[in-house]
From Swiss-Prot:
Involved in sporulation and maintenance of the mitochondrial DNA. Is probably involved in a pathway contributing to genomic integrity. This is Increased recombination centers protein 19. It comes from Saccharomyces cerevisiae (strain ATCC 204508 / S288c). One of its GO terms (biological process) is mitotic recombination. Keywords: Sporulation. It comes from the Eukaryota. The lineage of its organism: Eukaryota, Fungi, Dikarya, Ascomycota, Saccharomycotina. Belongs to the IRC19 family. Induction: During sporulation.
Amino acid sequence: MRKPSITITTAKAIITPDYTLIKSHSKYQLPSRFQKLDADSPERSTVVKLFYRRFMRLKPFISNVKMVKDTYRDYVRYKFMKENYELKRYLVFNPDGLRSKINLELLSNTKCCERILPVTEMQRTLEFVLKSCSYLPETKVQKWDIARDNTYCRQILKNLLTMQYEKYRSILHRGIGHDELDVKFSHLKTTSSPLTKLNKTEKKKIPLFKVFSDFDTTLIYLNETLGTRL
């Protein structure tokens, strides 16, 4: 049975049984381009809050499923408040033999507020998420390339959130600590270590760590290609 054709118009949106058209986009988009800021810039806090609010405002458009929206919310919080992306990137691009103990210690001990603010990458990431929330029908007649690009963004974000949810499940139910996966990135270290150097507990984690390691490695390379910070 077809849904009744009802259209609701408000000051902010036009709503049909299938789609919602947002009239004003200003609170989801950046007001202007920002230059890369250093850790001592007095504007740093303002810019971080500006990006954070816009990512969070997109939460209702991520999915109709509460679990997915909650995972998105938790992931955004983690990215802004806890993730040491420079350490994660270093572990991906530097195999065991090329890793410097000094560099690892410096990156591991760098506080979030002391890191360079990657404004350009954050802006491109916001554009990526905006595309994943936007819908255009894929037809050859009208904007097929734009519609397909939005679909790719939506599928990538869906896979990312699915994997992040699996990490949360592993932390809750599989005896893997939060620090191992999201702070120390042990899964990017253990899988490349010789088995003789691992204890029994670490060996049990290898299959799951391999899955997370492959995904995060691919994600880092994707970010390098797109100039994003997914």
